[in-house]
Amino acid sequence: MNYFPWLTIIVVLPISAGSLILFLPYKGNKTIRWYTICICILELLITTYAFCYHFQLDDPLIQLEEDYKWVNFFDFHWRLGIDGLSIGPILLTGFITTLATLAARPVTRDSRLLHLLMLAMYSGQIGSFSSRDLLLFFIMWELELIPVYLLLSMWGGGKKRLYSATKFILYTAGGSIFLLMGVLGMDLYGSNEPTLNFETLANQSYPVALEILFYFGFIIAFAVKSPIIPLHTWLPDTHGEAHYSTCMLLAGILLKMGAYGLIRINMELLPHAHSIFSPWLVIVGTMQIIYAASTSPGQRNLKKRIAYSSVSHMGFIIIGIGSITDAGLNGAILQIISHGFIGAALFFLAGTSYDRIRLIYLDEMGGIAIQMPKIFTMFSSFSMASLALPGMSGFVAELIVFFGIITSQKYFLMPKILITFVMAIGMILTPIYSLSMSRQMFYGYKLFNTTNSFFSDSGPRELFVSISIFLPVIGIGIYPDFVLSLSVDKVEAILSNYFYR
């Protein structure tokens, strides 16, 4: 047991400091903005320090554990802890949220509330990744809903922002009902004393029918958030209307919470049901890659096209989770981190382009590479990362998932060949929509009626955010062990404890 409450500080600091924004004397947006950025940087530094000096990489068990009794009636504890599965997403959350706060600089309306909501999201995301109590996980999961709804409805850029915000909250709240039913069902089943402790629940056995019922409840909630087809339709609308700082948080972190939940709860707590349904996950993931890669080129809206590319990339994560192999699951975790960076960067650059040319439809753009060479260079680089160019993080992640499904002992040879073939088609379709997006934006003749003096290329802020994201994308592509070393022992423990015993 760890005696210094590192994780409690990391979870509580953002929302506590965010609440103080309301009491700060108003001296302009600049003060609030710098206060929020300083809180995010402080949080990231504390997290990095705690993980560097108090986390043992070669230990697959839960570390930095904290356990405080909260509600005695149904064994509800403030129970936190991290392992190799959660450390990567937590660091990703800190990194992307800090840059998203910097990206929100152009927003001047209701600046206090905006930054409070971003910090509240920060706490909810870190809390979800570090919870070791099922009900605490649910509460942290729900902490996301209202901030995202308000960020969409108040600072969204399009005419349909209220529609998109309502659609988001209906989908996610609907999924959360199934999540709550699963949480309460697991809490009340079996033992004389109800328990929500992950450790206890991992060793709990259920009748097959009941385990499948719980599995369905959880997978619906996580399928909405991931998203998994056909529960993905909120995502393009949400991304199409949201401010790009919100899009960075959605693409970089929020979608990854669904994938994390699939591994943490469906795989770890319900292994027999997962073993039964993993072939269906692989099939759905394969269909998702093809479906989203085929749908993306038909989108006129730039941000919707990037959103469909996110849906396609999430398909690789689902296949990795369904493969039930060391390589597949490690590849899925690497893809979670990799796409967190790439998705956030693409939305950021799409937003900075919109700030300058005030156009979001691709068929109205064209020929802006000459006026904005820095944005063109960065956008092209991240497009290459998105289509899994060798040397970048996406290539390594997708290659490891490929290897995982090919070497899986669970599937016969012909299904594996078919799945691999369809995945390869999806990877061929990815450059089609990625490169056509760049061509329509940056090449050709100038199609819009604006004077050249209107344009300004990327400033120091945009360059800093873009390069800060690009460096880890290249770093992971060249040396993926930097991320894989965090999760490899935990992945081995999950698979050996639950599938090969």
UniProtKB/Swiss-Prot annotation:
Q: Which top-level group of life is the source organism from?
A: Eukaryota
Give the catalysed reaction(s), semicolon-separated: a plastoquinone + NADH + (n+1) H(+)(in) = a plastoquinol + NAD(+) + n H(+)(out); a plastoquinone + NADPH + (n+1) H(+)(in) = a plastoquinol + NADP(+) + n H(+)(out)
Compartment list: Plastid, Chloroplast thylakoid membrane
**Example GO molecular function term?**
NADH dehydrogenase (ubiquinone) activity
Keywords assigned by UniProt, alphabetized:
Chloroplast, Membrane, NAD, NADP, Plastid, Plastoquinone, Quinone, Thylakoid, Translocase, Transmembrane, Transmembrane helix
Q: What class of enzyme is it?
A: translocase
| One protein family per Pfam | Proton_antipo_M
Q: Which GO terms describe its biological process?
A: ATP synthesis coupled electron transport; electron transport coupled proton transport
What InterPro entries does the annotation carry? NADH_Q_OxRdtase_chain4, NADH_Q_OxRdtase_chainM/4, NADH_UbQ_OxRdtase, ND/Mrp_TM
What GO CC annotations are associated with the protein?
A: chloroplast thylakoid membrane
EC number(s) in its UniProt entry? 7.1.1.-
Keyword Translocase attached: yes
Membrane-spanning regions, if any? Answer: 4-24, 35-55, 84-104, 111-129, 134-154, 168-188, 209-229, 243-263, 273-293, 306-326, 331-351, 387-407, 417-437, 463-483
Where would you say this protein principally sits, based on its record?
plastid
Q: How does it sit in the membrane?
A: Multi-pass membrane protein
PANTHER family on file: NAD(P)H-QUINONE OXIDOREDUCTASE CHAIN 4, CHLOROPLASTIC (PTHR43507:SF21), NADH-UBIQUINONE OXIDOREDUCTASE CHAIN 4 (PTHR43507)
Task: Give the family, as the similarity comment puts it.
Answer: Belongs to the complex I subunit 4 family.
Q: What is this protein called?
A: NAD(P)H-quinone oxidoreductase chain 4, chloroplastic
